[in-house]
UniProtKB/Swiss-Prot annotation:
Organism encoding this protein: Vibrio vulnificus (strain CMCP6)
Assembly and binders: Monomer and homodimer.
NCBIfam families (alphabetical): moaA
Job of this protein: Catalyzes the cyclization of GTP to (8S)-3',8-cyclo-7,8-dihydroguanosine 5'-triphosphate.
Binding locations of [4Fe-4S] cluster 1: 29, 33, 36
Recorded family membership: Belongs to the radical SAM superfamily. MoaA family.
Record's protein name: GTP 3',8-cyclase
Presence of keyword Thylakoid: no
InterPro entries on file: Aldolase_TIM, Elp3/MiaA/NifB-like_rSAM, MoaA, MoaA_twitch, MoCo_biosynth_MoaA/MoaC, rSAM
Entry-linked HAMAP family: MoaA_B
């Protein structure tokens, strides 16, 4: 079976190299976040067995690893709802060439299971905490689980995680004024806060118009108060990360509406049903699943991905109001 050579590393026509795979393993979620699934998860009518199985996951991750991908983020939906989630982590972590295995979770199962996830090979975790006010957290997520999630973060440090990343979706009139509370929280904790601008998707146009707020004000505040921009690694995400000598924690800003946001794009997405998505806001998904059934299909799988990469756009078109085919962020893993 042919591996990619260095010259065949996944690369698009704009010479962007792809070191980072976001792999969704389910679109099911048990939270009802206002910016994602405000009415809760609505089953498609298909059985959950239609999601990628362990063998398919192993094959797609190996193909990406053989073509230069070194980081995999396991996403959802809520990925920990998969009964075989720990096995998925182990499968990804056991793949030659994969150096970092991450997941994004709502945190509700962390306190109980984070130890086994770490033992299986998980070495980076992102937890969604959209407010430090338990009542606002409940309002945004639809679940009264604030203290449970916070206990999960504490437990992550107890089992040996050196840093936990915390995602906060910025929303005007809901949580955009909580910066002082968040700064106080991370002063003596190795937490990287990641403020994410609300993004427009097919089903969330009204919410976007009501609650979108730019991260520029936060960035200006940080710079004015002595925070410094940190240099990125090749497989890091799109966050602008700021550090301060008086803070153990860090602040990241993800601002997709900013000019040149896509210039350093380094990630591709595979959905829980086995479709390749070149962009979170692309207008189509490319079927890969038919090439995930046998180990000897890897060269054909790689060829299909390489071919599709040449159609990847230079940028999304969010500023023109084009949100692509993504109905909500849970559908292809955010």
């Amino acid at each position: 079976m042919e591996r990619c050579s260095v010259a065949q590393q996944f690369e698009d026509r704009f010479h962007r190299k792809f070191y980072y795979l976001r792999l969704s393993v389910t679109d099911v979620c048990n939270f009802k976040c206002t910016y994602c699934l405000p009415d809760g998860y609505q089953p498609s009518g298909q059985k959950n067995s239609s999601f990628l199985n362990l063998s398919e996951i192993r094959r797609v991750v190996k193909a990406f690893a053989d073509c230069g991908t070194s980081k995999v983020r396991i996403t959802g939906g809520e990925p920990s709802l998969r009964k075989d989630f720990t096995d998925i982590i182990h499968t990804v972590a056991s793949t030659q060439g994969i150096k970092r295995v991450a997941t994004t979770t709502n945190g509700y199962r962390m306190e109980k299971h984070i130890g086994e996830w770490k033992e299986a090979g998980l070495n980076q975790i992102n937890v969604s905490v959209d407010s430090l006010d338990p009542r606002m957290f409940h309002q945004i997520t639809g679940e009264n689980k604030f203290h449970q999630v916070m206990s999960g973060i504490d437990r992550a440090f107890e089992v040996g995680f050196e840093q936990v990343k915390v995602n906060v979706v910025l929303m005007k009139d809901l949580n955009h004024n909580e910066l002082p509370a968040f700064l106080h929280w991370i002063k003596h904790r190795p937490i990287q806060l990641r403020f994410i601008e609300l993004m427009q998707t097919g089903e969330m146009d009204t919410l976007f118009q009501q609650h979108h707020v730019s991260g520029v004000a936060i960035r200006n505040h940080l710079i004015a108060n002595g925070w410094l921009l940190k240099v990125k690694a090749a497989n890091d995400g799109p966050a602008q990360v700021f550090v301060h000598p008086d803070y153990q924690g860090e602040i990241g800003l993800i601002m997709p509406y900013e000019k040149d946001f896509c210039a350093s794009c380094n990630r591709l997405r595979v959905s829980a049903k086995g479709k390749l998505h070149l962009c979170l806001f692309g207008d189509r998904g490319v079927e890969l699943r038919d090439l995930l059934q046998q180990d000897d299909q890897e060269s054909d799988l790689i060829a299909r991905i390489q071919s599709e990469l040449q159609t990847k756009s230079v940028s999304h078109f969010l500023n023109e109001g084009q949100t692509g085919m993504t109905p909500h962020l849970a559908s292809i893993g955010g």
